[in-house]
Amino acid sequence: KWFIDQVRARFNEKRYQYVDLAGFYWIAEDASHTGNIITPIANYLNELKYSFNWIPFFNSDGHESWKELGFHYAYYQPNYYFDDKIPLTRLDEACKEALRCNMQMEMEFEDDVLAAHGKAYRLENYMAKFKEYGVWEKCRLAYYQSNNALLTLKYSSEPADVALYHKFCKFVIERPIRDSH
């Protein structure tokens, strides 16, 4: 409670004109060691009318019981992008599991998304699979893009990178479901 109260107080002191404190994010990516404190925190945030969000990793402990733990939204991490040895079927499995558990999804990519690094196809695969399974049109999406991946794509001198940047932006802005929280 102390931490939440401190964040709220410091945020309110700033009197931001165009930014709202809409909710809180639980940083632990599984529920193995924190499960007993999540629900009381969720209850407190509910009293304060804040959203409580979680992004568990693929097949993590507790991902199926995210609602029972008290989260408003859980965004399932496919963890597909990072390791080239992980097959495309991981995205199929992740999409099916997220839909089965009524979860949202996370799209992941990093600064090595540039064509020169040979990983652009993995971001392309996320976009294709999210559309194939209806995630793009039915689910909220969280985006993990490392440090500067979008800027790196946008300002690349390689036309394929800039094209991927525009394709990704179009993917985001044309989604049927878009709201702030």
What is the role of each PLM region?
Residues K1-D20, K129-F130:
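An active-site-proximal structural segment forming one wall of the substrate-binding cleft
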Residues R8, I38-S51, C95-L99:
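Surface-exposed amphipathic alpha-helices with a cationic face
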Residues Q17-E29, H63, K67-K85:
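Aromatic- and acid-rich polysaccharide-binding/catalytic face
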Residues I4-N12, F57-W66, I86-A94:
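Alpha-helical scaffolding within the catalytic cores
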Residues N59, F71-H181:
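Substrate-binding cleft of secreted/luminal carbohydrate-active enzymes
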Residues K1-I4, D20-D30, A42-H63, M107-E108:
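Aromatic-lined carbohydrate-recognition surfaces of secreted/lumenal glycan-active proteins
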Residues A31-S32, N36-I38:
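Beta-propeller domains
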